[in-house]
Amino acid sequence: MARFQEFYKEKVVPGLIEKFGYKSVMEVPRITKITLNMGLGEAVADKKIIENAVGDLTKIAGQKPVVTKARKAIAGFKIRQGYPIGAMVTLRGRAMYEFLDRFVTVALPRVRDFRGVSGRAFDGRGNYNIGVKEQIIFPEIDYDKIDALRGLNISITTTAKTDDEAKALLASFKFPFRN
């Protein structure tokens, strides 16, 4: 069992039951999935960009991402339907908890001028989104072997009904909120 998964069962669940007064353990919010998404609009000109991004996401997530394709043609962006324009990977279960552990304890402290993540990035339904400007904050990525700095979006989906419940859940996982 992953370290954060054990931590969730032993420390987070009792803490949230006490804070919000849940009657059942099944009412306690939990993280269902973490989605990593890399939008690569510049990949229209060069197919090698997609391969490098897929390689980076594979190292970061520990599983192979799916290449996302354009749903419809947009002449202004010079893309046609079916063009590869991004890569995404969905993490669940053990891989999700291991990624969350690495992200909170190792990757976030490596961000330059880091003062904490925003507490306002919740969507109103208990899900949290965070944008990472450069993939080199992850220790799996070797700085000398990357071709370009790429950002990615990390979406944390929870079963929480409100943003307050979701924030309490993530804060109990030692998420460094600044406000």
UniProtKB/Swiss-Prot annotation:
The keyword Secreted does not apply. InterPro entries: Ribosomal_uL5 (IPR002132), Ribosomal_uL5_bac-type (IPR020930), Ribosomal_uL5_C (IPR031309), Ribosomal_uL5_CS (IPR020929), Ribosomal_uL5_dom_sf (IPR022803), Ribosomal_uL5_N (IPR031310). Belongs to the universal ribosomal protein uL5 family. GO terms for biological process: translation. It comes from Burkholderia pseudomallei (strain K96243). The lineage of its organism: Bacteria, Pseudomonadati, Pseudomonadota, Betaproteobacteria, Burkholderiales. GO terms for cellular component: ribonucleoprotein complex; ribosome. This is Large ribosomal subunit protein uL5. Keywords: Ribonucleoprotein, Ribosomal protein, RNA-binding, rRNA-binding, tRNA-binding. This is one of the proteins that bind and probably mediate the attachment of the 5S RNA into the large ribosomal subunit, where it forms part of the central protuberance. In the 70S ribosome it contacts protein S13 of the 30S subunit (bridge B1b), connecting the 2 subunits; this bridge is implicated in subunit movement. Contacts the P site tRNA; the 5S rRNA and some of its associated proteins might help stabilize positioning of ribosome-bound tRNAs.
